[in-house]
């Protein structure tokens, strides 16, 4: 019988003498050998051409001296590498938009916290304090048992004290008046007045001061009427051309030479307007605050001067029959003048700077006109009343131009907000809004004689064309280039037959384009400065008047 785990003594002896044999395992290290140079890591490259770092180097290593031992007698800031007094400055090219965004984001940290108005709350504590002050100024609601007399019941209809009756605008003006002592020092008579009377007198003057001048006129002829009792308003019949025809029936050409110069203004001329239909008179407004009317035929002399504005003339507009015209100036007034007698018939004071003015072209509304102001509004007036009839206020910037469409039923306006809006006349809501991120401000707009297109002078040195009816879309096939406006508001217009487009140049050139091909046909060196105003004669084939804002001369071309 076999016993489990049975073994003899001889077998144990053999097992003790045999060696313990184990298999050999060969392991391999696949990582490459890396030399850990601790000293090399502590050394910072100080090469003059080195612009890159392979690791994040501490600041104390970056600013330590390149060579030599450390100086124990200087501070850490003095021992650093600097190319200026305060530190190390490097040249960096940053766009203006990015710089302004970063700079003005920390304006409050540079200039401190702005001063808030008394009526403006900044924190929740200020809101509570403000509401408490309002409650303290609240009048006594009274006794419910008393209906009339002293102590009568007012309830929730009780008013506030005298402090609350002042508007926030008056508070802000009061603070501004207290900080300004220039006028009181110059005026010796104001020192005799009481402080309260002086403040009332200064607060009574509006922030936008309107300058009103006395209207005068000067006739530069011996007499107004001739032997047949005709004034210069009479359309001449002895000039070799019928001036009573409808403009545009003639074939127009580009002028080639300078034939005459009108001189009389002492400063630059801002606008030119030919007499409607006949064009036998030329109206000019200048930076010398004067308006002059010139004779286009015969001796081409100065006929009359209109004086009544305290600031330079901004825009002019003839009425439909030409017997009167509107003028707007930087003195924030709009005046209606009699073309023949030179009298000021009416003055429309809007207390705002008016950039443009335009008479209504609808024959049924000859007494109405529109004015575009710098405070984003278009005002509608009637010459028989100085009050505002209607206001259009959807623009976000100052109004630059007003152009009537579809025989006065609609009109289009352009603004500093780089947008164009189409309106129904009499309705203060735009029917079409044109704006794009690539659009620039378009300060001048002109309607083509056929009434189907408008040309817009853009500040990106191009003239764009839009349809003047139905959907009012841009005609992208027609873009007129080849001139530079340099930010100036330069006149743009059409020849009477619509064949050519003209505009001024910032270099003093008068530019002409072909309407069909959009090709620049001619550049006439007209003036030494920007040609701000140009006017094509409504009856002649190739006569154009030009003026500049740098000289007081009007040049006539043929």
UniProtKB/Swiss-Prot annotation:
One of its GO terms (biological process) is mRNA splicing, via spliceosome. It is found in: Nucleus. GO terms for molecular function: mRNA binding. CDD domains: WD40. GO terms for cellular component: catalytic step 2 spliceosome; nucleus; post-mRNA release spliceosomal complex; Prp19 complex; spliceosomal complex. SMART domains: WD40 (SM00320). Residues 126-141, 180-189 have a biased composition (Basic and acidic residues). WD repeats lie at residues 264-304, 308-349, 351-391, 394-433, 437-476, 484-523, 526-558. Belongs to the 40S cdc5-associated complex (or cwf complex), a spliceosome sub-complex reminiscent of a late-stage spliceosome composed of the U2, U5 and U6 snRNAs and at least brr2, cdc5, cwf2/prp3, cwf3/syf1, cwf4/syf3, cwf5/ecm2, spp42/cwf6, cwf7/spf27, cwf8, cwf9, cwf10, cwf11, cwf12, prp45/cwf13, cwf14, cwf15, cwf16, cwf17, cwf18, cwf19, cwf20, cwf21, cwf22, cwf23, cwf24, cwf25, cwf26, cyp7/cwf27, cwf28, cwf29/ist3, lea1, msl1, prp5/cwf1, prp10, prp12/sap130, prp17, prp22, sap61, sap62, sap114, sap145, slu7, smb1, smd1, smd3, smf1, smg1 and syf2. Functions in the second step of pre-mRNA splicing. Involved in splicing intron which are longer than 200 nucleotides. This is Pre-mRNA-processing factor 17. It comes from Schizosaccharomyces pombe (strain 972 / ATCC 24843).
